[in-house]
C-alpha cells in the first residue's frame, strides 16, 4: 500500500480563493473588508517569517491588515493597553499575538485580554470552553485546519479510534475536542505516556503533534490508517521533517500529510477563515 497525499497547500489555496470571493462580495455590498491586527514582539527570525506570511495572506484575500512590530523591551502593560485599544476598534475583527513572546511577558494573561469574539487564533479560555461544550465559536486554527483536511479525504470519522500524540494547548488538547465532536474515540498521549507504540498501532487516525522529529515510527502505523503530521522540525542538514517517519508510514497508511505542505498552509488559511467569520457573524 502507498498512501495518498493530503495536499494541504492545494486545499488551503482553494479556501483562500473562497474567502477572497466573500470579501469581494462584501465590498460590492458596501461593507468593509475584515480587519486583522498582528502583534509581533522582538526579532525572533521564525516569528518574523510566520508574520510576513500572514500579512501576505491578508493582502491576497483583500483583508485590512494592521501590523504592530514592537521591540523586545515592550512591557506587559504596554501590550495590554494596545490590546485594549484594538478590542474597541470597530475596524478590527481579529487580534493575533505572535508566539513565542520574550520571557518577561505573560502570554496567558495577554491572550486572555483579547476579546473572545476577536480571538481569531482560538486560544482564549472562553473559546476553548465553547469547543468543549460542543458549541464552537472561534476554533483553534490548526485543529480546525486538520478537520478540513480530514473532510477532504471523504473518510467517515464516526467511531474511528484516534490517537493524538502531544497534549499542547495549541494543538493536542483542542484537537482531541474536535475529534470528540466528530464522533471519534480519542486517546491523547504525552511525554509521560507508556507504550506510545501500542497506542499508535491501534489507531485508525493518528495526529502527530509533539515537535520531535521521527518520534512516530512508520512500523507503528496501522495498515489503512490516516496520518496527520503536524510537526515541522529542521534537522542539522537543513531538511524539514515531521514527527512521523514519512516513507515507512506512507507504505502502510491510506492517507498521509506531507511535511512541509500539509498542515501548515491550513493553519494560515483557517486564521483568515476565523477573521472572516468574526466580521460576518460576530461584528455585524
Curated annotation (Swiss-Prot):
One of its GO terms (molecular function) is methylenetetrahydrofolate dehydrogenase (NADP+) activity. GO terms for biological process: L-histidine biosynthetic process; methionine biosynthetic process; purine nucleotide biosynthetic process; tetrahydrofolate interconversion. SUPFAM superfamilies: Aminoacid dehydrogenase-like, N-terminal domain (SSF53223), NAD(P)-binding Rossmann-fold domains (SSF51735). NADP(+) binds at residues 166-168, 232. PROSITE patterns: THF_DHG_CYH_1 (PS00766). It catalyses: (6R)-5,10-methylene-5,6,7,8-tetrahydrofolate + NADP(+) = (6R)-5,10-methenyltetrahydrofolate + NADPH; (6R)-5,10-methenyltetrahydrofolate + H2O = (6R)-10-formyltetrahydrofolate + H(+). InterPro entries: Aminoacid_DH-like_N_sf, NAD(P)-bd_dom_sf, THF_DH/CycHdrlase, THF_DH/CycHdrlase_cat_dom, THF_DH/CycHdrlase_CS, THF_DH/CycHdrlase_NAD-bd_dom. HAMAP family: THF_DHG_CYH. Homodimer. Catalyzes the oxidation of 5,10-methylenetetrahydrofolate to 5,10-methenyltetrahydrofolate and then the hydrolysis of 5,10-methenyltetrahydrofolate to 10-formyltetrahydrofolate. Belongs to the tetrahydrofolate dehydrogenase/cyclohydrolase family. This is Bifunctional protein FolD. It comes from Azotobacter vinelandii (strain DJ / ATCC BAA-1303). The gene is folD.
Amino acid at each position: 500500500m502507498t498512501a495518498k497525499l493530503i495536499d494541504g497547500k492545494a486545499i488551503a489555496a482553494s479556501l483562500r480563493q473562497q474567502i477572497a470571493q466573500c470579501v469581494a462580495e462584501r465590498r460590492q455590498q458596501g461593507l468593509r473588508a475584515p480587519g486583522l491586527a498582528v502583534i509581533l514582539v522582538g526579532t525572533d527570525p521564525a516569528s518574523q517569517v510566520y508574520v510576513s506570511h500572514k500579512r501576505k495572506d491578508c493582502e491576497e484575500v483583500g483583508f485590512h491588515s494592521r501590523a504592530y512590530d514592537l521591540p523586545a523591551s515592550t512591557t506587559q502593560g504596554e501590550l495590554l493597553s494596545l490590546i485594549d485599544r484594538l478590542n474597541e476598534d470597530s475596524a478590527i475583527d481579529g487580534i493575533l499575538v505572535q508566539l513565542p513572546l520574550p520571557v518577561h511577558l505573560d502570554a496567558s494573561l495577554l491572550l486572555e485580554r483579547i476579546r473572545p469574539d476577536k480571538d481569531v487564533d482560538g486560544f482564549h479560555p472562553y473559546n476553548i470552553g465553547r469547543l468543549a461544550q460542543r458549541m464552537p465559536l472561534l476554533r483553534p486554527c490548526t485543529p480546525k485546519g486538520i478537520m478540513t483536511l480530514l473532510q477532504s479525504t471523504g473518510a467517515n470519522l464516526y467511531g474511528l479510534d484516534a490517537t493524538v500524540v502531544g497534549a499542547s494547548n495549541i494543538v493536542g488538547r483542542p484537537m482531541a475536542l474536535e475529534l470528540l465532536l466528530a464522533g471519534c474515540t480519542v486517546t491523547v498521549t504525552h511525554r509521560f505516556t507508556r507504550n506510545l507504540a501500542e497506542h499508535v498501532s491501534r489507531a485508525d487516525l493518528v495526529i502527530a503533534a509533539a515537535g520531535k522529529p521521527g518520534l512516530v515510527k512508520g512500523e507503528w502505523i496501522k495498515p489503512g490508517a490516516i496520518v496527520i503530521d503536524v510537526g515541522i522540525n529542521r534537522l542539522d542538514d537543513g531538511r524539514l521533517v515531521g514527527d512521523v517517519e514519512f516513507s515507512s508510514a506512507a507504505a502502510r497508511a491510506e492517507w498521509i500529510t506531507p511535511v512541509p505542505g500539509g498542515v501548515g498552509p491550513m493553519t494560515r488559511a483557517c486564521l483568515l477563515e476565523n477573521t472572516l467569520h468574526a466580521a460576518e457573524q460576530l461584528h455585524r
